[in-house]
Amino acid sequence: MTQQDKEVLINLLNQYKDLGISEQIDFQKFYIYSIIAHSTAIEGSTVTEVEAQLLFDEGITSSKRTMQEQMMNLDLKAAYEYGMKWIQQHEPITVDWLISLAAKVMNHTGSEYNTMDGSFSAARGELRKLNVSAGLGGPSYMSYQKVPSRLAAFCDELNKRRSSADKTDLYAIYYLSFWAHYELVTIHPWADGNGRTARLLMNLLQMEYDLLPVRVLKEDKIAYIQALVDTRNNEDISIFIDSMMQLHIEHLRNDIDKFLKTTEEGDSDGTKETAQNNVAENVAEKLTDRQRIIVELVTQGAAQNVAVNTKYLSEKLNVNRKTIQRDMAHLQERRLIQWVGSDKTGHWEIIKEVK
């Protein structure tokens, strides 16, 4: 992930905070409900967010969904509630604790297994005693005999990273959580529930330091799984890390855009305008000299009825178009400019004046 991408992530998180999106009534509850519904959907559940909300808050089940699907959601909700309280104690993460976490994830849907090496229960979070593969004909995960020692080593490394992490470095904490997700799902300690438990652990590590948890939507499933596969095949953790960072950036953008659209009408007290002004003031300090000049040129263009596009700015500043495009992306992330019109004949306009 480039330094620019890191800045984009931080700026979007700041904008999210400045707009007060997470301060809305019951935001955290519904945000977690969304995470749960999509996490189970990735594993085959067809329960929608609305159905999950009715199930969680009112105990209303859907006749369109199987009991198995609905129990998947109720179990994962219980696991999140347990984990969110526990993680704030900042205790070491151990193999026994991961087993207890997995037991909550699979409480009512886990199966009993009988193997040559003994029986075990997914509902109790017990480690697998059989070998598993990634789908029919897919690559096999590590031998089950290696799982206990590998899981213990993972816990030791995770706790070291947690204790040495810079709590003020948001990117570093997200990195840690994505690393933990990948490592746990790669070890694949259980016969079932590995994906849900890995995503849960990822979110808990983020919440431990008050970061906005990352959602993996059902629409992200193909890209998400492909990132896991590519990382494994190339033995390059940066592939998964970058993919998850970009996923979070995309969802932050979408949430911000949706929030702004829903507050465009009926805002008589000026709250939205005040929030946007605060955002503009905060980000203006982080602009480069060239970016400030670009803002001035776009402003002048509007006053002189000149269509300012990438080619125009490239010629004016005597820099290549790729450089201009990076600057424009930077300004767009800060919601200072926007593109108006078609790709070929459109132009840039100012959203907020930089003071």
Task: List the model feature ranges, each with a label.
Residues 1-192, 196-355:
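FIC/Doc superfamily catalytic core
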